[in-house]
A protein has these predicted regions:
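Extracellular and secretory-pathway beta-repeat/beta-biased strand scaffolds
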Residues: 1-275
Length: 275
């Protein structure tokens, strides 16, 4: 993919919809001097990534879709830098500007250096689901209202950060998308008890998870449910890893390997599920 708007060392792309079909690849061109590529989806549909998503160069790739992101069983990543996927509605920058997916008519970005964080302030954040093999050379970050990964997450030389957060949260980042900390609302922010994950996967027939008659997501064969604010992880390989759930953190037949720190954080329960 070519084009976009260059501002300093950043390249900005906007899409009405963004999907990668099974067996196909979508690669962002990486002009000289570009260190980070920021892409936002301004339409009303989730992104379905069923093929390979990558960068033709060393730039970090950020994908923002407030409607949800689904990585299918054949999905893979091919960036030489870091990857961040989020259902936040906006990226925040050091000069006070935002790259918003829900308010794309804001004044154009002029001079932007590095992102400071992602912001969730448009109701219950949508879900991210991964059933594929997501691997990066540097950092791999998935940030949503619910994050369920029954596939592979791999960043042997970097950080893997997976976080499920409530509306009103701001997540602070490094210049490469590494999660630094989470500023969650202390109180007063209503939560939607419906399942954004169910909406994302209900017609997909994907392994490990199913949507029951009450439109809630369950682990196949267990009866345990996944609600908004949960994180589900199966295979994680990284230098360091931080898995943060607003509600429950569930490790499904998990194989988690790190050479450095491993942080498992849950507002409610950490569950280990085997079949």
């Amino acid at each position: 993919m070519e084009g976009g708007a260059i501002r300093g060392a950043n390249l900005f792309h906007s899409f009405q919809e963004f999907n990668v079909r099974d067996g196909r690849g979508a690669y962002f061109n990486n002009p000289a001097g570009i260190e980070s590529i920021f892409s936002r989806v301004t339409g009303n549909n989730a992104s379905n990534i069923n093929g390979k998503l990558g960068v033709l160069g060393n730039a970090n790739l950020f994908l923002l879709n407030p409607n949800g992101i689904l990585f299918g069983p054949n999905a893979s990543l091919d960036p030489n830098g870091s990857f961040l996927g989020s259902t936040a509605n906006a990226l925040k920058f050091g000069d006070g500007k935002e790259f918003s997916a829900t308010n794309p008519t804001t004044p154009p970005l002029l001079s932007v250096s590095v992102p400071l964080g992602v912001q969730f302030n448009q109701g219950q954040p949508s879900a991210i689901a991964n059933f594929g093999n997501l691997s990066t050379r540097q950092n791999l970050t998935l940030l949503g209202g619910t994050v369920a990964s029954t596939g592979q997450l791999s960043a042997p030389e970097g950080q893997i950060a997976v976080a499920a957060v409530p509306n009103g949260s701001v997540l602070n980042l490094s210049s490469t998308g590494q999660l630094l900390n989470i500023a969650a609302p202390s109180s007063g922010v209503p939560e939607n008890l419906s399942s954004s994950l169910a909406e994302l996967i209900q017609n997909s027939n994907l392994p490990g998870l199913t949507v029951n008659s009450n439109e809630q997501v369950e682990f196949v064969g267990s009866g345990l449910s996944v609600v908004d604010g949960d994180v589900v992880a199966k295979n994680v390989i990284a230098k360091t890893a931080t898995l943060t759930a607003h509600h429950n953190l569930t490790l499904v037949e998990s194989q988690i390997g790190t050479t450095g720190d491993l942080n498992l954080l849950a507002g409610d329960t950490v569950r280990v599920l085997g079949y």
